[in-house]
Amino acid sequence: MVYCCYYLYFCSIIILMIILLFIIVLWYGGLFFQTFFLHRYAAHQTYTMSKTVERITFILTWVFQGSNYLSAYGYGVMHRMHHAYADTEKDPHSPKYDLNIFSMMWKTKNIYYQINKQQIEVAPKFTKNVPQWKRFDDFASSWVSRLAWSIAYFSFFFVYTTSLWQWLLFPVVLLMAPIHGVIINWYGHIFGYVNFKSKDTSKNLFKFDFLMMGEGYHNNHHKHSSSPNFGGVRWHEIDVTYKIMQLLHFVGIIHLKPSPLLLKREV
């Protein structure tokens, strides 16, 4: 009887670890392609890659973001607008001009959709050289694709969950990209510290950004938007994504552009 209890306890721990590992892979996999491809490539073009590698990266972004897939074109254009209009009425997402997290994210969703479907006119400076694979984007952004991924996630939870409380983790999987957006675009403009004086409210959320792979160094990024390295101003600001990019540059998969030297902090 005692051995049976130990066995059941051990099995429940293993199953919980499988679920957590699944969520961790989706969290950091989706986040990596968001910051590496959508942000630092599509929006800021801090490096170059071949057309073949670009297409492979489109597909990998879809694989890891799944039902949360974000278009490089929609994201890249909207993010350029965010930098141009940061914390003004034209900013696609700003805590200063939105009542709460939900209203900000709803507005962001609508603007992103209108940009991606080219339903609104956008200045050429925001669209210049932003990568676009329209046929693939139309498929990856479709409700068929999103529903298929959602069913796959549901099936995983149906097979592995052993307690009702574990289903509380299911919405995290379905809403992972919006959660990433809230952390940076809401909390990253309210909490944290600054290295540089700025006209906007951008903050560095973490001393070591273990959660957002460098995205949390938001104040640094707003000061040096053309730099592929979001960290490096203080000794503890290690940008994990940039370290991976250096490795990809070393083996020839991408080619980092010369970036300006990081200035010493002003604050």
What is the meaning of each model-derived region?
Residues 1-183, 217, 226-267:
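Non-catalytic, topology-defining segments of multipass membrane proteins
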